[in-house]
């Protein structure tokens, strides 16, 4: 199924389709991985004005929370493409996973994405999948651009003197944006 999506994606030469179509096709690709089966439940939540979803499995502790930031080069990627991965992360860690659709380029420039993620992390400290309530453990994680964001968010929280996550798990972080690297 992923192979068909790749062929479809690269056969499109109509630039009028734009970023919206590019993002949608990218999400189709990531959600089609048959090796990552979705499990548990996911439900939408308003994260202080940012669209989000809580992802949980039967062993998820609602007071142990991970803010997971999707990859996508700071320009693509949404919650939809990461639900399966988040459900597996919830199952393996026993945590509740919060996914958010943070601001993307080129529509919004730096530091909008970091500010959205900081706002979501602060919100998550006091709000869980069961509503208001403090968390006992908090984590920030992400892959690629999301991994870079997880580092940037944590450093920005530190600079602000805000509460820090108990741990950060950056997967293949795109942390250096210099074109030389």
Locate each region found by the language model.
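Alpha/beta-hydrolase superfamily serine-hydrolase fold, recognizing
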Residues: 10, 41-181
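A glycine/proline-hinged amphipathic helix-loop "lid/cap" segment
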Residues: 1-57
